[in-house]
Regions:
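Charged, flexible cofactor/metal-binding loops and thiol motifs
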Residues: 233-339
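Conserved ABC transporter NBD signature motif
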Residues: 62-73
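P-loop NTP-binding/switch modules centered on Walker-like glycine-rich loops
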Residues: 180-262
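Helix-to-loop junction immediately C-terminal to a conserved catalytic motif
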Residues: 54
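ABC ATPase NBD coupling module
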Residues: 71-89, 107, 115, 121, ...
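Conserved ABC ATPase signature
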Residues: 146-150, 154
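Conserved catalytic motifs of ABC-family nucleotide-binding domains
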Residues: 167
Length: 350
C-alpha cells in the first residue's frame, strides 16, 4: 500500500551540473497518521529534503508524490495552487526568521488562510483561535503581540499554529525543538504526538537530536551526506543499529543510548583512508573503521528485516568484528562505536 508521501530516487544539487548532490537518490515513505523522524548531522541534507518535499526546492531527478499526485514537477500557477491548498504544511526551522516581525501573532497565523482565499473573515478568525488553542496559546492574551514580545517557546508554537491552521494532512517540522529548554521541548513533542493521535495527521520531524524522536516517532531515516544509510522502526534502529554511522549517532546521545562518548563528528578517519571519493563509493568510507575494497562501490539500501534497510556492504559483519574485539589489538573502531555495538549485541542476546 502506498503512503501519503512517497519520495523516490530524489536527487538535488546546486550550482554546476557536476556538483556533488546535496541529496542523492533518497527514498522515503510516510503513511497516514505516522510520525517519521529524519536524523543526521548538520549538513547531511535534512532541511533540503524537507524543502524539496514541499516544493520550495526543485529536484534534479526523482519523484515526490503526495496523496497520489506527483508534486515534484509542479511549476508556476500549479505549484502556487498546491501550496495554497495547505494540505502539506511546513514549519520552518527558525521562528525568528520565519515569522514577520511586523505581524502580530494573530495575523501571522491567519496569513496562510488568507492566501488560500476560500474562507471569510469570520471563519479565518475562528480557525486562528482553534490553531492557537491547539498549541496551548491564549489567543486573547497573545494574539495582538508581535513575535519579539513573546518567549522562544511561544514563538515555536506560533509557528506550529500557523502550519496547522490550514488543517494539513501532513506536517513537516524542521528542528521544532532545537532551541528550546527542556520544558518547552517536551510541550512541543507532546503536541506533535497529539496532532497524530487526535487528528490523524502525519508528521515528519527533521532533527539532529535523537532523544526528540525516541518517544514519539514510529520510524526513522538516517541521512548522511545526502544519502539514507539506514531506515526502520525507531525502537529497532535505536536499539540495534545496522549501519556504523547510526551506531555513532546513538553513542553520542546519552539520553538515547544510556551512555556518553564524543559525538559522531569526532570520529577519526579509518586507518587506511580509501582512495576513492564519496561520490564514487560509500559516503561513509572516509570515516568508517570497517572499510574494505568492496566499499569502493556505493552500497544501495538493502532490506535487513521487516521494514528495515541499511546501505552497508558489511551488515552484519561489522557488528561481529566489534563483538570479537576483546580487547582489540588494532582497534576495529573508536571506543564509542565498540561500546554502542557491543552493548546492543548483549541486549539482543538477553
Amino acid at each position: 500500500m502506498s503512503g501519503l508521501l512517497e519520495i523516490s530516487g530524489l536527487t538535488v544539487a546546486f550550482g554546476r551540473r557536476d556538483a556533488r548532490p546535496v541529496l542523492d537518490g533518497v527514498e522515503l515513505s510516510v503513511a497516514e497518521g505516522e510520525i517519521v523522524g529524519v536524523i543526521g548531522e548538520t549538513g547531511s541534507g535534512k532541511t533540503t529534503l524537507a524543502r524539496t518535499a514541499v516544493g520550495l526546492v526543485p529536484p534534479r531527478s526523482g519523484r515526490v508524490v503526495f496523496d497520489g499526485r506527483e508534486i515534484s514537477g509542479l511549476r508556476g500557477r500549479a505549484l502556487r495552487a498546491f501550496r495554497r491548498s495547505g494540505r502539506l504544511s511546513y514549519a520552518f526551522q527558525d521562528p525568528l526568521r520565519a515569522l514577520d516581525p511586523e505581524l502580530t501573532v494573530r495575523r501571522a497565523v491567519a496569513e496562510p488562510l488568507a492566501v488560500a482565499g476560500d474562507l471569510g473573515d469570520t471563519e479565518i478568525a475562528a480557525r486562528v483561535d482553534e490553531a492557537l488553542e491547539t498549541v496551548g496559546l491564549d489567543a486573547a492574551r497573545l494574539g495582538d503581540r508581535l513575535p519579539g514580545a513573546i518567549s522562544g517557546g511561544q514563538r515555536q508554537r506560533v509557528l506550529l499554529a500557523r502550519a496547522i491552521a490550514t488543517r494539513p494532512r501532513l506536517l513537516i517540522a524542521d528542528e521544532p525543538v532545537s532551541a528550546l529548554d527542556a520544558s518547552n521541548r517536551n510541550r512541543v513533542l507532546r503536541l506533535l504526538d497529539r496532532l497524530r493521535t487526535e487528528r490523524g495527521m502525519a508528521v515528519v520531524v527533521i532533527s539532529h537530536d535523537l532523544s526528540s524522536l525516541a518517544g514519539i516517532a514510529d520510524r526513522v531515516a538516517v541521512l548522511y551526506r545526502g544519502r539514507v544509510v539506514e531506515q526502520g522502526p525507531v525502537r529497532e534502529v535505536f536499539g540495534r543499529p545496522l549501519h556504523p554511522y547510526t551506531a555513532l549517532l546513538i553513542a553520542s546521545a546519552p539520553s538515547v543510548r544510556g551512555g556518553g562518548g564524543p559525538g559522531a563528528a569526532a570520529l577519526p578517519p579509518s586507518a587506511e583512508p580509501p582512495s576513492w571519493t564519496a561520490r564514487e563509493g560509500c559516503v561513509f568510507g572516509h570515516r568508517c573503521p570497517f572499510v574494505i575494497g568492496s566499499c569502493r562501490t556505493a552500497p544501495a539500501p538493502a532490506p535487513v528485516g521487516p521494514g528495515r534497510t541499511a546501505a552497508c556492504h558489511r551488515v552484519p559483519q561489522w557488528r561481529e568484528l566489534v563483538a570479537e574485539a576483546t580487547p582489540p589489538v588494532t582497534a576495529p573502531g573508536p571506543p564509542e562505536l565498540v561500546a554502542a555495538a557491543g552493548e546492543t549485541d548483549k541486549e539482543a542476546g538477553r
